[in-house]
């Protein structure tokens, strides 16, 4: 039995509610949040919520708790019959016209975390204004009394309710796979491809022990594309890594590609995070290809294929996107970090945004979903390689008429709350010693503290919205300058 609902304050971060399993992320918390969602949806035209979950400790059981609370509150529930990526849930919500989606995941966070995030009927992250309303409901003083006494039983093999049984299980995977194959037109790309290229093409998949296990491989198998997988067994401990597709977490994938690339320039690796909405890539030489470069390749391809309208990026994304948009006369919006801010523009009536992306590996294509999708983006990259006959580095060189021109870096600092607050106060008051202050061209405070320089370099100092961290970002056209910007900020922080 779930214990009585507790009046503990629940606050949502950049992308939902996250916490340490058994500490602040509990069955009680999941039930309270889910019951609050039901209350928020009571006047919705649709009365169905889809629930998905990743491969983390107790994710299946937390999903069952969410489903139980929703059904007990009068909501129809469709529960995934297996773990699934976040974008797979998002597609199901949009395709089946659900009122909302609930995803149990902590995305790229370490193994001890879990989380819950909401999906809108558009298949996007729920808008911040809506999440704030749910947060207000869940923390209302009379909420516990109103919901106390609703019987919920959480079973490892299913659900049982004392008040009703208005739910079903569904396979979320099948329709999603069909959709991404149709949208990428991978079948046409493969059938029209150079035969020697197809023989050379080899893909290594790293789902990082997460919810993307089995998705890319099922598509590649269908088209007889040579592939292999690493870290592809469910292991909630994420041994040896955090499930975030960044350079420092992909040693095994890079090593695998380095060996293959000696003989094959069309070897490529794709990694997805814990819930497979983010992507990282590795080239044939074993070099990490970050999200800025992936964003650049896909954006350039879509523009050349005739896409028009606008693009949206978060404040921490590379200036390379500005350069591509300027070159092709494409409008560009810059928004706070969090894909929900990109989704808000993608789903706004009358808006012409066809693509959006963030620094952390989340890229969304409006014709698919107003949502980041690491699996779809991996297939889109693969299609671009097949159609162009070029590998990732050749594609990048073609975009900029030179090797990728920017050096980008991010460093995460663990700061106690006191030092973090002192830093923020100094930044707000203007007393923080900004590096190369005399060369500043602009400042931008829409999310954190961003400073742009006359030579195009920039610096961003921002507290994380999902973790107890301070993040420092910098970019310039020279690695020593990028590193210098970060080091000067660290020196100033250490003096606090």
Language model: regions and residue ranges:
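Proline/glycine-rich low-complexity loops and linkers
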Residues: 81, 133-177, 284-357, 363-365
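Phosphate-binding and adjacent anionic-ligand microenvironments
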Residues: 268, 307-496
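N-terminal small/polar loop signature for handling phosphorylated ligands or for N-terminal nucleophile
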Residues: 39, 48-113, 218-282
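Gly/Ser/Thr-enriched, mixed-charge loops and adjacent short helices
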Residues: 2-7, 114-262
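Buried hydrophobic positions in well-ordered alpha/beta secondary-structure cores of metabolic enzymes
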Residues: 15, 51, 89, 102, ...
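An N-terminal, well-structured beta->alpha segment
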Residues: 1-73, 99-100, 160-203
